[in-house]
Amino acid sequence: MTRLSSAFSKPHAALVTFITAGDGDTAANLDALVAGGADVIELGMPFTDPMADGPAIQEANIRSLGAGTTTADIFAIAAAFRARHPDTPLVLMGYANPMTIRGGEWFASECNKAGVDGVICVDIPPEEDAELGPVLRAAGIDLIRLATPTTDKARLPAVLDGASGFLYYVSVAGITGLQQAAQTSIDEAVARLKSYTDLPVAVGFGVRTPEQAANIAQVADGVVVGSALVELVARHGSNAAGALQNYVASLKHAIVAARKA
């Protein structure tokens, strides 16, 4: 069993948390997410044109790049995290340019050496992932795909072809962090996706409160929280770890209680 499959095999939905590499004290913040109860960590790779992200994550990208964060730094952060947390899955999330600028094989090799479990590439459609998909799979790294409210039954087979780890359902059309979908539409979407795949389905975009997380946890296999965490880093700077741990713990408590109810 892989680290990711183990995270999604618990009696409650997995709590998937996101922060941007190089924004604030990343090592301390990652440790805080784990201490708070995160089941999966998504580590954002900063990019100059994060078109799928809302203001909070865009600003985190600017802060990180302004601090001089490089791809080599991100892999060093990942490797150090793996040494400290051998059992917590780590997923790199970002855009094609930083992942492919030195070639897909190099990127997959670095992921493997750093102990990365999965990759989410926001801006490569399934038909165009020939540079990344095969080399990631060959390295044993999950390629996690995105589905949206506009992903219909004609499109879904292409999205699922070669996907592994989990399916990330983007619950609203648009950029991260600005709104949340109605719970009814999430329920319907998760049921529809699960009729097409055995992959765990995690729901994200716009999740902010323990109540929202609990509602999603009753139907989905995972709950993804990102912008709210990034905003805490922006607010607290290099001293964000305590706030992150407390907030994640409140989300985890709600998720566990929801699945047991």
Label the model's feature ranges.
Residues 1-18, 77-83, 256-261:
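N-terminal amphipathic alpha-helix/helix-capping segment at the start of soluble metabolic enzymes
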Residues 10-16, 85-95, 136-147, 194-205, ...:
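Short beta-strand/loop segments at the ligand-binding rim of alpha/beta enzyme cores
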Residues 20-24, 93-101, 125-126, 147-151, ...:
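Glycine-rich beta-to-alpha transition loops that act as phosphate-gripper elements at the mouths
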Residues 24-35, 151-161, 203, 207-223:
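Catalytic cores of alpha/beta
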